[in-house]
């Protein structure tokens, strides 16, 4: 989140949160961005959409947070930037996950396909159609192989997490 805020600055923004889950990323950004900012959040899970909507209400942000059930390829609107924590675990690695992850997460929120980038690529294919302005970027949280794989196909900058692993990517259009 701090990477996005440092990059964006103190301007108002209308942004999208793709794969919003509980809404933590989009709502945290709304709390830090100036008044007048807004977020369109989407997720394929109706339970996630309901949870993120309740969280927005609890934080007093429901007037600037709009969540709906849609996939990354169905994102529409015009956004200053997009943030996403898509499913990024390669399918072959799902069996090795800890029980506390598997038992409490919707499997669709975890399985990123063969290389962990299926949903990220769907979003990146859609992004040029919905990004506006001069700073047309998508911010992604991925597994540590994701940024390097993305850089083969996209103009991409990677960033390290608190453990020093490359887990964040900004893809510019």
Where are these regions (language model features)?
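Acidic-residue sensor for enzyme active/binding pockets
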Residues: 46, 100, 105, 141-144
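Class I S-adenosylmethionine-dependent transferase superfamily signal
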Residues: 29, 101, 123-127
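Conserved Class I SAM-dependent methyltransferase catalytic core
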Residues: 114-171
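C-terminal beta-strand of the catalytic ATP-binding
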Residues: 88, 172-173
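Helix-to-beta-strand junctions that scaffold the AdoMet/dcAdoMet cofactor pocket
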Residues: 34, 105, 131-134
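Conserved SAM/SAH cofactor-binding pocket of Class I
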Residues: 1-96
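Mobile active-site "lid"/loop adjacent to the S-adenosyl-L-methionine
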Residues: 88-119
């Amino acid at each position: 989140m701090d990477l996005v805020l440092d990059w964006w600055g103190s301007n108002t923004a209308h942004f999208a949160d793709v794969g919003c889950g509980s809404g933590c990323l989009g709502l945290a950004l709304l709390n830090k961005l100036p008044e007048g900012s807004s977020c369109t959040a989407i997720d394929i899970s109706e339970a996630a959409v309901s949870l993120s909507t309740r969280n927005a209400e609890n934080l007093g942000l429901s007037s600037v947070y709009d969540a709906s059930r849609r996939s990354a390829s169905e994102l529409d609107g015009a956004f200053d930037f997009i943030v996403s924590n898509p499913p990024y675990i390669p399918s072959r690695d799902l069996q090795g996950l800890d029980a506390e992850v598997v038992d409490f997460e919707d499997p669709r929120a975890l399985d990123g396909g063969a290389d962990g980038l299926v949903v990220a690529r769907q979003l990146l294919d859609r992004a040029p159609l919905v990004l506006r302005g001069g700073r047309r970027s998508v911010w992604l949280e991925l597994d540590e192989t994701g940024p390097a794989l993305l850089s083969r196909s996209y103009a991409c900058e990677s960033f390290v997490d608190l453990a020093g692993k490359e887990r964040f990517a900004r893809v510019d259009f």
